[in-house]
């Protein structure tokens, strides 16, 4: 049979299939339980000739980035990063708004954008050591200067307002808590002291509006302390058997993924607290952990233990559902990703190995 005859015989079938597809999915929209394919938009990164880019924060069209190089220790036993450049980049205009060569050498590993062309960054001072213990928070603007230095660990640094950032920390003297950082300096937003009943954890920190939430251990239990703008503290103690995987602070209260043992049965719970009530979803104990929880306006993201990106959505019953994301390129499945909340209901997903950046707007 000739090729033209075959094509002619297939045309009616192809026409029917095309009409069915258009009828089932107008405008390319997917079912309400799925994520529209157009919510992920790849963004440009600043061009570099040496090293690689690491995105630390995102606010609107601005990203805070560093250019870093991976180096080996003198004995070749371990690798470390050295920051060569700090910059603020507008992904829409595709141009740099500010670029600095760090006056203080080190590994700038966390950061927060401020209003204008300024930022606050977390710095490992003894970055060539296998286990750094000298840290600083640095201001970058019209000048570069140290806001605070400590021996211990600067753990998480997050934007708090257009003029401030928050950083969780612990010192070798036993003090721990949260610093409030601005161009004017450093103050204590939450100050605790380690003793027989109180101890720091991993420095997990979350921000929502003018409130923040910090995790530590008290009397052997994981405790989440939410601090309001007026300094009021609201402590939430998890069950004695609970182990914290991750959490985030929402307008209604904390969203928590935790491992618990109840009635000799191990399980994981994704719990949303709202108006004093707990809305729980049970997850598999073995592989149900969620990390890097980020949530805003009823949607968010997290990663599982295999770096699989998970979409979070608020359900009508008040619980938060979770499913794997399949809309991104296959090579980005189960690889390291940094989830950034942009503060406007959108999120940025930075893949350091692939050097790719996406904006995600789940409600679009």
Across the structure, where does each feature detected by a protein language model lie?
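Repeated scaffold domains used in trafficking and secretory/extracellular systems
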Residues: 50-60, 105-116, 152-162, 197-208, ...
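Blade-level signature of beta-propeller repeat domains, shared across WD40, Kelch, NHL, RCC1
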Residues: 334-364
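Surface-exposed loop/turn elements that mediate protein-protein interactions on large endomembrane-trafficking
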Residues: 32-46, 76-101, 128-150, 176-194, ...
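Bacterial signal peptide processing site
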Residues: 23-25
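Beta-strand C-termini and the immediately following turn/loop, strongest in propeller blades
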Residues: 65-73, 78-80, 121-129, 167-173, ...
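Bacterial N-terminal signal peptides that target proteins for export
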Residues: 1-11
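Beta-strand-rich domains and repeat architectures in extracellular enzymes and scaffolds
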Residues: 46-84
């Amino acid at each position: 049979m000739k090729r033209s005859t075959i094509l002619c015989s297939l045309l009616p079938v192809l026409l029917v299939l095309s009409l069915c597809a258009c009828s089932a999915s107008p405008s390319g929209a997917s079912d309400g339980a799925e994520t529209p394919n157009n919510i992920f938009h790849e963004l440009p990164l600043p061009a570099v000739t040496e090293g690689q880019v690491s995105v630390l924060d995102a606010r609107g069209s601005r990203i805070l980035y560093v250019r870093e190089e991976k180096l080996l220790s003198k004995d070749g036993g371990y690798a470390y990063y050295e920051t060569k450049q700090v910059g603020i980049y507008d992904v829409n205009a595709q141009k740099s708004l500010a670029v600095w060569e760090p006056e203080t050498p080190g590994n700038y590993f966390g950061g927060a954008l401020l209003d204008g062309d300024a930022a606050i960054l977390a710095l490992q001072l003894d970055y060539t050591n296998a286990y750094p213990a000298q840290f600083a928070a640095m201001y970058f603007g019209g000048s570069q200067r140290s806001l605070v230095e400590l021996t211990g660990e600067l753990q998480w640094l997050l934007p708090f307002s257009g003029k401030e950032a928050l950083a969780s920390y612990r010192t070798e003297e036993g003090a721990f808590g949260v610093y409030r950082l601005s161009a004017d300096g450093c103050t204590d937003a939450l100050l605790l002291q380690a003793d027989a009943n109180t101890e720091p954890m991993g420095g997990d920190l979350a921000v929502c509006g003018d409130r923040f939430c910090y995790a530590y251990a008290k009397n052997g239990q994981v405790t989440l302390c939410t601090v309001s703008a007026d300094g009021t503290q609201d402590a939430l103690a998890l069950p004695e058997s609970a182990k914290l995987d991750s959490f985030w602070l929402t307008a209604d209260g904390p969203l928590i993924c935790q491992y618990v043992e109840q009635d000799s049965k191990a399980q994981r719970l994704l719990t949303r607290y709202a108006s004093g009530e707990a809305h729980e979803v049970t997850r598999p104990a073995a592989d149900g952990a969620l990390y890097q929880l980020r949530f805003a306006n009823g949607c968010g993201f997290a990663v599982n233990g295999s770096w699989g990106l998970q979409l979070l959505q608020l359900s009508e019953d008040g619980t938060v559902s979770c499913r794997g994301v399949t809309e991104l390129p296959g090579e980005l499945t189960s690889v390291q990703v940094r989830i950034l909340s942009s503060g406007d209901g959108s999120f940025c997903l930075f893949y350091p190995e692939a050097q790719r950046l996406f904006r995600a707007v789940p409600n679009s």
